[in-house]
Amino acid sequence: RDYYASRGLGDVYKRQVLIVIAVVVLSIFFWFKGAYNGMVNMREAVSAQWSNVENQYQRRLDLIPNLVNTVKGYASHEENTLTEVVNARAKATQMQLNIDQLDEATLKKLSNVQGELSSALSRLMAISENYPDLKANQNFLDLQAQLEGTENRIAVERRKFNDVARSYNAFILQFPRNLVAGMFGFTSKPYFEANAGAENAPKVEF
């Protein structure tokens, strides 16, 4: 009787151990699953916000040919300024990057190229002060308003990108989620630096 009683107690103990192990394994699995899915969702949010930044950059690029042609019609001898804008636009067009290509070096290079374009556009818009007919041209006024709006949206979208990138980075770098991130190739994303106008819309003076 003692033998069977002790064996019964042993079976109960084994079942309890198995239950505890199963609970621990399931807890680890669900935590692991939650951490991984969270990283995927946050990485997708970063990618989506980067697309918003690129869309605003592209919108600005699309405005430039019409703007240059309009200014050229009234200030054709401002060749140097017009050429600067055209060249800066060409450089910016070549620097369109996928989110997976971004690191600190490439983002800094992109910011510099976009900053050069903003500066060239500011100089182009400033010459309207010397040409009253240009300044009064409705197409020019429309382009001016669109450009100002686009510059503001660029600044807003960059700030939003920094926010989601910081949240994503903080999430994947915290222990023990950093172990999951390392296993599945989740890497941190760079930020736009708050210098040289990177965080503020370039001011277009008239």
Q: Which role fits each region the language model picked out?
A:
Residues 1, 11-206:
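A helix-centric hydrophobic-segment signal that preferentially recognizes long
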